[in-house]
Amino acid sequence: MGVLEQIDQKELLALTGKNVEWLKPHSEGKYISVSLDVSDEFIHYVIDNDVNVSVVYSFCEQEDTQLWIGLPNLYYAGGTLTDKLISGELNKKNVDSYGLKLALFSQWDGKQDKAYSESLPYHFTSYNLISEPMSVCFSIQAVGMVNGTKSEVVKIPKTEFVFK
């Protein structure tokens, strides 16, 4: 993967091709660092502890199908965790304190289908945030949708979250 760089909102939009107006900076005005190697289907996010945003990236190649990765908000004080949907709606999950979870969402035709996203074969994985900095690596697989019909399984070989 390439060298990680601090990027602003416009640069992130150029990388992902998606509207990221809902992306908010943390207290110091910096944005999440992102490095994408689409050819290898690698997605790499680096966030600071005080970042309170969600970032999504489409990894499904079909034009009429988009599968999204949602990065949850982390709250260290009180030990609570929430998953923030693309729409900005908070979807609270019952998770252990100081945990990390990955959520998969489906979206097509510019609208999120919550009914289908609820039925997606989620691979929710929790990790304890024990030490900092830390790196969490895992693989993801999800069922795609084409014209409302389930299609082949889409795999991401590696997704890495690095907290520093």
Question: What positions do the PLM features span?
Answer:
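Short, solvent-exposed, Trp/other aromatic-anchored flexible loops in extracytoplasmic proteins
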Residues: 72-150
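N-terminal export/targeting and maturation segments
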Residues: 1-78, 148-164
